[in-house]
Amino acid sequence: MDQFIKQDETGDLIETGMNVANHFLSAPIQGTNSLSKASIIPGVAPVLIGNPEQKNIQHPTASHQGSKSKGSGSGVRSIIVPPSEASNGGTQIPEPLFAQTGQGGIVTTVYQDPTIQPTGSYRSVELAKIGKERMINRFVEKPRTSTPVTEFKRGAGSRAQGQTIQEEGIDGNGASAGSKERSGSLSGATLYAHLSLPQQDSTPANVGIAPQSAISANEIMDLLRGMDARLQHLEQKVDKVLAQGSMVTQIKNELSTVKTTLATIEGMMATVKIMDPGNPTGVPVDELRRSFSDHVTIVSGPGDVPFSSSEEPTLYLDELARPVSKPRPAKQTKPQPVKDLAGRKVMITKMITDCVANPQMKQAFEQRLAKASTEDALNDIKKDIIRSAI
């Protein structure tokens, strides 16, 4: 039996694997419908997960690796199949699972008819594993030995890379841990990264439903909205306060104008000298003295009739027809109304302050004003003040 895999079979296996990978990557898989250990047919799991006891792939030894480093290897690894399986045609095992796509792009796991036992062999499983491994290693670049970083020069990259490849190799039977090296492409390409191989472990994984979103997220959003509303309210109030700034400035200007006007009025009142009504200011002294002399006063109009007729003697006849003078009724004097002298005293006090400059005369007028209790006395004091000012 041929122990090597033909190139056509390898290409078919790789193409089949790529189609399966694209199929599962293009369809969304939910957590509750994904494959788990419980959905695999008993007997297939040890083969699929690749237990170390059932691996039949023979890796090259140190001698083969040494020959490969010298250029004698062809890059194809050999496969050893147990003689019992080669002679008997393989052990019957269940076929791998089939996947069907249901409604909404959900992938569900189904089996063939349970009454019919599918046929297969470990050889087909081994071939599938080899194809999968080669397909993975196809995109993984082997680690290279570290080389000193040199300044990039055009045309020198290929020679440095060739020199690095010639230095590869392992001495002895130990496994090489590899080494890091700068990427061969110095034109700005992204550095390569090793592909993470799937972990082959027989421990089942617990599948559960993803936790729901946190309940407190709504409270946080409500707090943020409340803070935003309060901030907008404060901004509106600040805008209103700033809008009143012009009005405050206008009120200040008007208040300054009122103060200026009041000061002007107070100054004018301080310069006004309170004088008798009808007595003009700026009259010569001689003319004022002539006005105080005695002279005839003519009163126009009907005059006081009782005053003019009371002086004439009148005879009357009594009950005996004798002429007698009728006795005149006693003239009743009308009580003069009491006048408020407080206002006059205030006026005279102001006149003393403004018109009298001599302190002695001012003190004398103040004493007379304090003793005055009638209107005539106040009038005399006022006349004396006017004479002293002239």
From Swiss-Prot:
The modification Phosphoserine is found at residues 69, 187, 256, 291, 293, 300, 373. Keywords: Phosphoprotein, Viral RNA replication. It comes from Mumps virus (strain SBL-1) (MuV). Residues 54-65 have a biased composition (Polar residues). This is Phosphoprotein. The lineage of its organism: Viruses, Riboviria, Orthornavirae, Negarnaviricota, Haploviricotina. Essential cofactor of the RNA polymerase L that plays a central role in the transcription and replication by forming the polymerase complex with RNA polymerase L and recruiting L to the genomic N-RNA template for RNA synthesis. Also plays a central role in the encapsidation of nascent RNA chains by forming the encapsidation complex with the nucleocapsid protein N (N-P complex). Acts as a chaperone for newly synthesized free N protein, so-called N0, allowing encapsidation of nascent RNA chains during replication. Residues 54-98, 144-183 are annotated as: Disordered. It comes from the Viruses. Homotetramer. Interacts (via multimerization domain) with polymerase L; this interaction forms the polymerase L-P complex. Interacts (via N-terminus) with N0 (via Ncore); this interaction allows P to chaperon N0 to avoid N polymerization before encapsidation. Interacts (via C-terminus) with N-RNA template; this interaction positions the polymerase on the template for both transcription and replication. Interacts with host RPS6KB1 kinase; this interaction may play a role in the viral replication and transcription. The keyword Calcium does not apply. Belongs to the rubulavirus/avulavirus P protein family. Residues 342-390 are annotated as: Interaction with the nucleoprotein. The N-terminus consists of a long intrinsically disordered tail. The central part contains the coiled-coil multimerization domain (MD or OD). Forms a four-stranded coiled coil structure. The C-terminus constitutes the alpha-helical X domain (XD) that binds to the nucleocapsid (N-RNA complex) and the L polymerase. The modification Phosphothreonine is found at residues 10, 16, 91, 150, 164, 249, 257, 281, 297, 374.
